[in-house]
């Protein structure tokens, strides 16, 4: 039985530790000590060959610099997002510390609460090293169907961008604009993130599969989604600071929105949904912003 170390004991990290424990000997660690089975120190985790890292995107760079020493690990990254300060995708950040052929990225539609209930789930493991993807795929339980892909760019763009669309969808729901408007917003969001993905060499098929459309439809249509709930808060007139405090969890879409806004300005890209979400996070009246977008 393979030993796997999970770094990050939030909802998603804990859910993955639960799922992987069916076939693996799993250990877990986090910044804050937890009263959990198989909770160990980071030093013990880093002695293992297989690592699953579920650290939020905005914390990854500092954590890698301060705590991570590569020791021939095989790494599966289980977070999605773009670093707001640098505009870097997670693969760009991790590849500064881990060889490309030793790292994979997890994507696809997955709520942690449903994984914890062993409900059917499908995920994609993305890596340039197909043998590595196959290794990690073998660790997942029967209720999680895994697929593999080499399109890291597609998985990274889709996984990050869908959180921004989910914020917009939450605003749409909170304003009571109806299901017609929501369907229009989500489908246009899919086109927007696919167009953005081409800038990074992403493949079109990734956006119509689990990593793209699948994850987008899940995240942008349910109050189980943190980013959707951010949108609901904006529709209620709350500031992003108030929303984050009430949420008590990381909503990756906020940092990703700011990153996309900066990238769009730098590269002169037309990203209307990301732009409007940025304006609304900055305090623009959502009644004005979203209605104007939907009518144009």
From Swiss-Prot:
Sn-glycerol 3-phosphate binds at residues 80, 108, 110, 162, 215, 225-227. Pfam families: NAD_Gly3P_dh_C (PF07479), NAD_Gly3P_dh_N (PF01210). It is found in: Cytoplasm. GO terms for cellular component: cytosol. GO terms for biological process: carbohydrate metabolic process; glycerol-3-phosphate biosynthetic process; glycerol-3-phosphate catabolic process; glycerophospholipid metabolic process; phospholipid biosynthetic process. Keywords: Cytoplasm, Lipid biosynthesis, Lipid metabolism, NAD, NADP, Nucleotide-binding, Oxidoreductase, Phospholipid biosynthesis, Phospholipid metabolism. This is Glycerol-3-phosphate dehydrogenase [NAD(P)+]. It catalyses: sn-glycerol 3-phosphate + NAD(+) = dihydroxyacetone phosphate + NADH + H(+); sn-glycerol 3-phosphate + NADP(+) = dihydroxyacetone phosphate + NADPH + H(+). GO terms for molecular function: glycerol-3-phosphate dehydrogenase [NAD(P)+] activity; NAD binding. Pathway: Membrane lipid metabolism; glycerophospholipid metabolism. Its EC number is 1.1.1.94. Gene3D superfamilies: N-(1-d-carboxylethyl)-l-norvaline Dehydrogenase, domain 2, NAD(P)-binding Rossmann-like Domain. Transmembrane segments: none annotated. PROSITE patterns: NAD_G3PDH. InterPro entries: 6-PGluconate_DH-like_C_sf, 6PGD_dom2, G3P_DH_NAD-dep, G3P_DH_NAD-dep_C, G3P_DH_NAD-dep_N, NAD(P)-bd_dom_sf. It is an enzyme of class 1 (oxidoreductase). NADPH binds at residues 12, 31, 80, 112, 226, 250, 252. Catalyzes the reduction of the glycolytic intermediate dihydroxyacetone phosphate (DHAP) to sn-glycerol 3-phosphate (G3P), the key precursor for phospholipid synthesis. The active site is at residue 162. Belongs to the NAD-dependent glycerol-3-phosphate dehydrogenase family. Its main location: cytoplasm.
């Amino acid at each position: 039985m393979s030993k796997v170390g999970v770094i990050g004991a939030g909802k998603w990290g804990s859910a993955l530790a639960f799922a992987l424990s069916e076939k693996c000997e799993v250990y877990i660690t986090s910044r804050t000590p937890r009263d959990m089975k198989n909770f160990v120190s980071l030093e013990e985790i880093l002695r293992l060959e297989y690592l699953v890292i579920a650290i939020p995107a905005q914390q990854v760079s500092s954590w890698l610099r301060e705590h991570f020493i590569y020791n021939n690990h095989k790494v599966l990254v289980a977070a999605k997002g773009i670093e707001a300060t640098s505009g870097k995708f997670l693969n760009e950040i991790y590849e500064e510390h881990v060889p490309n052929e030793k790292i994979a990225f997890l994507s696809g539609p997955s709520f942690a609460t449903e994984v914890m209930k062993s409900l059917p789930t499908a995920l994609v493991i993305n890596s340039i090293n197909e043998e590595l993807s196959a290794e990690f795929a073998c660790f997942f339980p029967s209720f999680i169907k895994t697929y593999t892909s080499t399109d890291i760019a597609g998985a990274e763009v889709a996984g990050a961008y869908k959180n921004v669309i989910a914020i917009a969808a939450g605003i749409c729901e909170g304003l009571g604009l109806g299901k017609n408007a929501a369907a229009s917003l989500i489908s246009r969001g899919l086109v927007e993130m696919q167009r953005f993905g081409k800038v990074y060499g992403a493949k079109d098929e990734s956006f119509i599969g689990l990593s793209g459309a699948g994850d987008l439809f899940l995240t942008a249509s349910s109050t189980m989604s943190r980013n959707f709930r951010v949108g609901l808060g904006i529709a209620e007139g709350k500031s992003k600071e108030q929303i984050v405090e009430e949420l008590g969890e990381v909503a990756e879409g906020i940092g990703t929105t700011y990153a996309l806004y900066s990238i769009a300005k730098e590269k002169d890209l037309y990203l209307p949904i990301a732009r409007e979400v940025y304006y609304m996070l900055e305090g623009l009246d959502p009644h004005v912003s979203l209605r104007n977008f939907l009518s144009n």
